[in-house]
């Protein structure tokens, strides 16, 4: 709603959902951009890098919420298996999609920083995300669904 994500990209999402179950708008693949202040950019970029490193998944974007789901496949996704809440939900969704081998694709997007206001993410949420990240790593290591 703050136009950080360009609504014109939605048609690309819809087109790709014909052949994929999940589409992720990615700031960190070729063609993608993240136009935000340097501090927020560093937190976002290194946060995504750290998640990718810990979970060892072939994805570049874990924290962006600009995504599309194929509704026919969403029924078999079992959303109740995603225990992550708040902002960790975005990371948890990618983890579950990759671990259950759903067909997904990342497409480049341009993310623009909001023009007014502050980040909506409370600092405690970063701590919760770290706890959820290591919980997901444990699940992956122990091969728990």
Predicted features and spans:
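The conserved acidic donor/metal-binding loop of glycosyltransferases
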Residues: 1-4
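Catalytic donor-sugar/metal-binding loop of nucleotide-sugar-dependent glycosyltransferases
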Residues: 57-58, 81-85, 94-112
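Short, hydrophobic alpha-helical packing/hinge segments within bilobed ligand-binding/sensory domains
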Residues: 65, 93-94
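Short-chain dehydrogenase/reductase
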Residues: 90
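C-terminal catalytic/acceptor-binding lobe
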Residues: 100-145
């Amino acid at each position: 709603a703050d136009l950080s994500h360009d609504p014109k990209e939605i048609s690309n999402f819809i087109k790709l959902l014909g052949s994929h179950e999940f589409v992720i708008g990615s700031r960190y693949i070729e063609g993608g951009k993240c136009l935000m202040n340097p501090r927020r950019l560093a937190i976002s970029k290194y946060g995504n890098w750290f998640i990718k490193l810990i979970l060892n998944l072939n994805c570049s974007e874990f924290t962006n919420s600009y995504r599309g789901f194929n509704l026919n496949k969403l029924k078999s996704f079992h959303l109740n298996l995603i225990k992550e809440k708040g902002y960790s939900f975005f990371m948890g969704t990618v983890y579950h999609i990759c671990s259950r081998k759903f067909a997904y694709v990342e497409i480049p997007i341009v993310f623009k920083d909001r023009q007014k206001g502050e980040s909506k993410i409370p600092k405690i949420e970063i701590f919760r995300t770290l706890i959820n990240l290591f919980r997901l790593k444990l699940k992956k290591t122990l091969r728990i669904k």
